[in-house]
């Protein structure tokens, strides 16, 4: 009897072990749970349904759990739209099940590629918020494949270690009115308060862009976002320019311009989609653009200027923040088609103040400054450095330094206000004129007055301008309400090709940018003198006295 009982128990144990082995290795396939699962979903939301195939059960001896898996299920929304899935799987803890606790340990869902609109409609049936309505309006089309990993605690709540991953394919998103991102593709990974996007590709205004990463991290009630954006060399269009710059850029011709860029950015985004603390670091290369600028001032110096400046190999490094904008740039520029020159510049904007530094290489430009008898020939090394700032209506050139071989022109603290000179601290001329005469003079400010001193100066233009105070060409009208005394001490002044005067001494009283008094003395030699006097009378009439022992240098130039 005992032997039979023992034999029976042994058979039962063997069968039980075989059953456990079978369940753990092969599993059990059934469809008995399908109606139960469908009923549970219907009770949660009557607009949702699920199409299940057979469910497979696997026994996990190591974790004392049962793994439930089903292949190719479909979630049906309002009997029409479908979300097709590759697999749904879950683990049920046996110990929790028998203790009547929440037994589901985890839930894994792997979808197929479905229309993004279907995912949105599914979510709307669960939580129809304003944000999801806005997202639905912005997304025009596209597909997505999504993987969901959820872990549950003993009370059935989702743990914070959830994971949402997948990829978006060929999406279209409206970013502005009539502006759409096309062919949008990216991979994504979402977990607790962190959103990561990688391998981002899209097309905007027919230009291909890509991004290696875009990270979003939730902090309290805001999101911190950082990422990068790139594009390979492609042809630019006006829509791109207008979307970046609000100013009128009609003076630029971008018709043949190709560009490439690399940008890194970070900012904070509130729940109301307000951007704060935006910072952008961009490197931008423009192969060619044309500046259309009609300027008579430029033509006064460069005779063959045709209102076009061709800019090539343009490189810009732009750093933007709310507090400051910094631009470093360089270009090759062409005024004559076959002769290139270069420019390097830095611009910094803080509030209403704009600081600038510029270095121009002018080797291959020929130009002249007629008022000071200066002429530069082509292929002669020359540089121009300019440093200053603009603040509201005030424009200050802290330093202007022009160098060409042994020639040098320096201007310090030249202040422009309302298109007129309101101040200048120093002007230095040290160059050989086009008449092969050395110009060596300095204009120096002392308190509110000036001294013009030097060894030599090749021009009578200064005397002509001073003497012409009653005409429309009054030299001092370029100044803003100038009220100063000017003392002039120049050893030698060239009047024309054959005449010079020595020891030119003058004293000027300037009031409201006009000559009030002038006394000028000089000599051709010991016996030949030059004297000019201008006196303003009490009735505001002007008495001018002129004497020269040589008439020839002045007969054609001086207006009696």
List PLM regions with ranges.
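Membrane-interface motif at the C-terminal end of an N-terminal transmembrane signal
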Residues: 16-34
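Classical Sec-dependent N-terminal signal peptides that target proteins to the secretory pathway
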Residues: 3-22, 192
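Short, cysteine-centered beta-strand-loop-beta hairpins and adjacent loop/turn segments enriched
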Residues: 73-82, 174-176
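Extracellular/periplasmic ligand-binding regions of membrane signal-transduction receptors
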Residues: 65-75
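Membrane-proximal interfacial segments on either side of biological membranes
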Residues: 2-7, 30-66, 88-560
């Amino acid at each position: 009897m005992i032997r039979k009982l023992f034999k029976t128990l042994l058979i039962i144990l063997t069968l039980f072990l075989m059953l456990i082995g079978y369940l753990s290795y092969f599993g059990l396939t059934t469809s008995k749970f399908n109606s139960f699962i469908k009923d549970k979903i219907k009770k949660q939301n009557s607009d949702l349904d699920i199409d299940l195939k057979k469910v497979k059960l696997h026994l996990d001896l190591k974790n004392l759990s049962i793994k439930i898996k089903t292949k190719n299920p479909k979630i049906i929304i309002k009997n029409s739209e479908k979300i097709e899935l590759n697999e749904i799987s879950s683990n049920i803890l046996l110990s929790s099940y028998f203790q009547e606790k929440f037994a589901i340990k985890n839930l894994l869902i792997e979808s197929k590629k479905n229309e993004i609109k279907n995912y949105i409609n599914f979510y709307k049936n669960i939580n129809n918020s304003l944000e999801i309505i806005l997202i639905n309006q912005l997304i025009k089309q596209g597909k997505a494949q999504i993987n969901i990993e959820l872990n549950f605690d003993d009370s059935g709540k989702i743990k914070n270690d959830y994971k949402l991953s997948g990829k978006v394919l060929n999406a279209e998103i409206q970013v502005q009115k009539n502006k759409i991102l096309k062919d949008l593709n990216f991979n994504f990974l979402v977990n607790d308060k962190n959103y990561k996007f990688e391998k981002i590709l899209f097309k905007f205004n027919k230009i291909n862009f890509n991004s290696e990463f875009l990270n979003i991290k939730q902090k309290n009630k805001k999101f911190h976002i950082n990422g990068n954006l790139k594009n390979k060399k492609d042809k630019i269009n006006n829509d791109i320019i207008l979307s970046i710059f609000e100013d009128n850029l009609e003076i630029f011709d971008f018709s043949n311009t190709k560009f490439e860029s690399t940008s890194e950015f970070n900012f904070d985004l509130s729940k109301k989609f307000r951007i704060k603390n935006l910072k952008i670091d961009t490197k931008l290369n423009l192969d060619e653009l044309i500046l259309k600028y009609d300027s008579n001032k430029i033509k006064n110096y460069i005779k063959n200027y045709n209102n076009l400046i061709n800019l090539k190999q343009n490189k810009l490094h732009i750093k933007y923040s709310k507090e400051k904008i910094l631009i470093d740039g360089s270009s090759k520029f062409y005024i004559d088609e076959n002769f290139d020159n270069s420019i390097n510049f830095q611009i910094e904007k803080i509030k209403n103040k704009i600081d600038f530094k510029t270095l121009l290489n002018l080797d291959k430009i020929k130009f002249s400054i007629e008022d000071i008898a200066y002429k530069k020939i082509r292929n002669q090394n020359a540089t121009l450095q300019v440093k200053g700032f603009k603040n509201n209506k005030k424009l200050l050139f802290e330093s202007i330094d022009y160098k060409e071989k042994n020639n040098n022109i320096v201007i310090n603290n030249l202040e422009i206000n309302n298109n007129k000179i309101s101040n200048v601290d120093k002007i230095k001329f040290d160059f050989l004129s086009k008449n092969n005469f050395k110009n060596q003079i300095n204009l120096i400010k002392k308190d509110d007055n000036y001294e013009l001193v030097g060894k030599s100066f090749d021009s009578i233009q200064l005397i002509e301008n001073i003497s012409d105070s009653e005409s429309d060409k009054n030299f001092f009208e370029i100044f803003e309400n100038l009220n100063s005394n000017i003392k002039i001490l120049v050893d030698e002044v060239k009047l024309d090709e054959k005449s010079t005067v020595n020891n030119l001494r003058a004293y000027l009283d300037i009031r409201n940018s006009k000559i009030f008094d002038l006394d000028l003395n000089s000599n051709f030699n010991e016996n030949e003198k030059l004297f000019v006097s201008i006196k303003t009378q009490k009735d505001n009439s002007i008495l001018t006295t002129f004497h020269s022992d040589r008439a020839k240098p002045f007969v054609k130039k001086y207006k009696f």
